[in-house]
Amino acid sequence: MVSYASIPQSSDEAHSTVGASLQLDERKQDLNNFIQRHIGPSSADIQQMLDVLGFSSLDDLIEKTVPSAIRLHEQLQLPEAQTEYAALAKLKQIASKNQVFRSYIGMGYYDTITPSVIGRNILENPGWYTAYTPYQPEIAQGRLEALLNFQTMIIDLTGLEIANASLLDEATAAAEAMSMSYGVSKNKANAYFVSHDCHPQIIDVLQTRAKPLGIEIIIGDHQTFDFDKPIFGAVLQYPASDGTIYDYRAFIETSHAQGALVTVAADPLSLTLLTPPGEFGADIAVGSTQRFGIPLGFGGPHAAYFATKEEYKRQVPGRIVGVSKDVHGKTALRLALQTREQHIRREKATSNICTAQVLLAVMASMYAVYHGPEGLKQIAERIHHLTLVLGVWLQRLGYTITSQSFFDTLQIKLGEKPLQEILEAAEAYRINLRIVDTSTVGISLDETTTLEDVKDICRIFAGTDELPFVLNVQEFDWIIQQSSLKDEPFSRQSSYLTHPVFNRYHSETELLRYLHRLETKDLSLTTSMIPLGSCTMKLNATSEMIPVTWEEFGRIHPFAPLTQTRGYQILFQQLEAWLGEITGFAGVSLQPNAGSQGEYTGLLVIRQYHQSRGETHRNVCLIPNSAHGTNPASAVMCGMKVVAVACDAGGNIDIDDLKAKAEKHSHELAALMVTYPSTHGVFEAGIQEICAVIHSHGGQVYMDGANMNAQVGICRPGDIGADVCHLNLHKTFCIPHGGGGPGMGPIGVASHLVPFLPGHPVLESGKNPQNIGAVAAAPWGSASILVISWMYIVMMGADGLTQATKVAILNANYIAKKLAAYYPVLYKGQNGLVAHECILDLRALKKSANIEIDDIAKRLIDYGFHAPTVSWPVAGTIMVEPTESESQAELDRFCEALIAIRQEIADIEAGKVDIQDNSLKNAPHTVESLIVGEWPHPYSREQAAYPAPWTREHKFWPSVGRIDAAFGDRNFVCSCLPMDAYN
């Protein structure tokens, strides 16, 4: 009840009271800022952890950790931090400047309908999007099953034998197919045929990839190509970019006679109606699953696919999910054939792909699960029938259709009709068409197209709202009969998606429960911290994620006119400027759509720079032994020769060895690839000297930005001496890992390298003759998820970003300090401190207790934790990165788990516990192993299942026991097994 006495009696008094209350409200708002939501430890926690480390303040810690010569002494020039509400409102304003037209541009991108049950329960669900790549398969069976469904879907639709678990985009997949063909072809040719009917972005990405490898690209007509020059491979579009469906069998037979491999870039939805590539002789099929319920997003992210013959299984790029079994004989899934991946094969790898598009592959697979084979076919038939209607009506209006065999795309000759007149009418109807040339336009229909949309398109060409025809049943039936797809050689006769998983979950209730069952099999950030070194598994805040699903960002075609994408342009300009400020670089490209692609792009820019100066001989890339495996793989892709540089006993680059190698290769030195802080988790004091050595020999310094979470606001790559740096936005800038993608890997470059940044054939900016060409299918890569990083920077501001870096370093040092008495910290920087991660040395445990690194990783699952990075960068170690988002309580739980495990090992060392039959060797423990049959082990069920107090409050149960990796590789299966195999 309000007392009258409390009401101000004068206007002055009222004014002062209102002012005070407003100030109070502002103070409350400040207390509720996003920075405190993002950073896990409270102020009291931070002080307590500093006390443990013996420091009075965070600044004191940073002063002792980061070399003074490289520290940034000025605040970053970034916008002031905004609340979540204010940031969302500001971004909504920007989004409103995008215009959502009906886009019938095609070229591999189509509007689609994301089933609400998939959007809400996968795309918007942190249980799916905050997980990591399934390197610990026992706690990743859910998304591994979803990815196996994806692979099965692709195998069935393409008619090939094996498929991987996604690639970055269709153009990149085509480039990977070219590289694989080059590697396995035995005819020694170095020319690759590219059909001129491929999408322009595919052709451009292939040209970019081919140039440094010395591959000659021959662009031509497959119908007239006479094979006068030997080729090792070819790529064909199916259907062609202009919509035409060709019979490619004769071309493929002739190619095979030469020993060449043929890749078909195929639209997977069309394959529900068309003869699959595998059935007419294709060796490889690639494409995009974007139209399987994944929003356009102005170019991405989308899951590409890659399918081929089983004989090439060890040459396939990217990850493959395979079927194996666990220790109890139960069917279990894992990543198969991992020894072919870049992090193991390094410079011998044929691909540098690491992060792919797992989250989007899961969505696409569930789209197929939800609709089933009949549902997909109905969608495809409906699109095709509407395209037939459109074609007939346009012909009746006097226009010429260039092809009589098509699925969803038409090209129309305008005749005497001016192109500008068509475009102005289309704009009035808020419709986008593909401009092929001054007298030709293209139209691609999609799942969202209605008959009324078709009428609107016809009104554009008729020049009037009144159409001279009506569609009745008889007319419709007659038009459908005109389809060439019902006849050989185009009509698909083989069945597909016959596995029960594609025929069981067609009601929303059933799919919802299936998705939830899979989700609960996986450990994500919704369960506990994921302390993977070099992975930065920080908070992916809900406010950062929400805009991804806004229509203003999601329904924009990547080749829509720039006049319709003002909002995106503002977003890009701001983000490029902020990332440039954070890194100290003059220019930024947002096109690379993964960290691996950022590396590749950065090195291509360096290569192009040297060539522009007439120094084509510069092709040696120095890489420390400790580098990420993608580094040497990327260098080889850029036509460079890798020369390894040694590390000293402290884990730092051996500067004497670096100087010797730089001197030896001075004439041909192109670049040094260096990670900072180092992959050993320390700030190397000699980093500026290292950069100076390379520059003195005419080389450029490429800095791997994987560890940028320890630099933001404290030091900058450009100031340190780097010429190029890629950023993992899915690490430092909060884009979630998605269980193995999406990622984004933009690069920052010094001013002298700006002219060489990527271009794109569909944009005016792509016509700069100095640029390296396109490295991704879309001009700004996976544009729609850039809103996540934009939101993070806006809500954190300069102070918040810097504080996050400091706390990330604090958390890592706190863990190192707490665990040092139990596990030696392998490398430390100056003053005995680590950067944002630390390496714990477990090598002695093999000798003392017969304990392998894997035993500790699997036992951590029983405690409810994902293992840190295992056996990298040093075999027999674990690398821990807690990030700034984890609270002190969570750090303490993790430390207590590792300390308890060390005690279990001590019991083995003391002979109290059997060296073979113990809680580590048998980990992880499933519910079934605990309750079914006799308990044969010398330790209790309680110790197995509830080794720590918090596991009684909330227990994460692995769905399978330890998986037999070797069995899965010996008995390679990468598609769904019969359902009884899971029982």
Swiss-Prot record:
Pfam families: GcvP2_C, GDC-P. Transmembrane segments: none annotated. It is an enzyme of class 1 (oxidoreductase). The modification N6-(pyridoxal phosphate)lysine is found at residue 731. It comes from the Bacteria. CDD domains: GDC-P (cd00613). It catalyses: N(6)-[(R)-lipoyl]-L-lysyl-[glycine-cleavage complex H protein] + glycine + H(+) = N(6)-[(R)-S(8)-aminomethyldihydrolipoyl]-L-lysyl-[glycine-cleavage complex H protein] + CO2. Gene3D superfamilies: Aspartate Aminotransferase, domain 1, Type I PLP-dependent aspartate aminotransferase-like (Major domain). InterPro entries: GcvP (IPR003437), GDC-P_C (IPR049316), GDC-P_N (IPR049315), GDC_P (IPR020581), PyrdxlP-dep_Trfase (IPR015424), PyrdxlP-dep_Trfase_major (IPR015421), PyrdxlP-dep_Trfase_small (IPR015422). GO terms for molecular function: glycine binding; glycine dehydrogenase (decarboxylating) activity; pyridoxal phosphate binding. Keywords: Oxidoreductase, Pyridoxal phosphate. Its EC number is 1.4.4.2. One of its GO terms (cellular component) is glycine cleavage complex. Its cofactor is pyridoxal 5'-phosphate. GO terms for biological process: glycine decarboxylation via glycine cleavage system. The glycine cleavage system is composed of four proteins: P, T, L and H. The glycine cleavage system catalyzes the degradation of glycine. The P protein binds the alpha-amino group of glycine through its pyridoxal phosphate cofactor; CO(2) is released and the remaining methylamine moiety is then transferred to the lipoamide cofactor of the H protein. PANTHER family: GLYCINE DEHYDROGENASE (DECARBOXYLATING), MITOCHONDRIAL, GLYCINE DEHYDROGENASE, DECARBOXYLATING. Belongs to the GcvP family. This is Glycine dehydrogenase (decarboxylating). It comes from Nostoc sp. (strain PCC 7120 / SAG 25.82 / UTEX 2576).
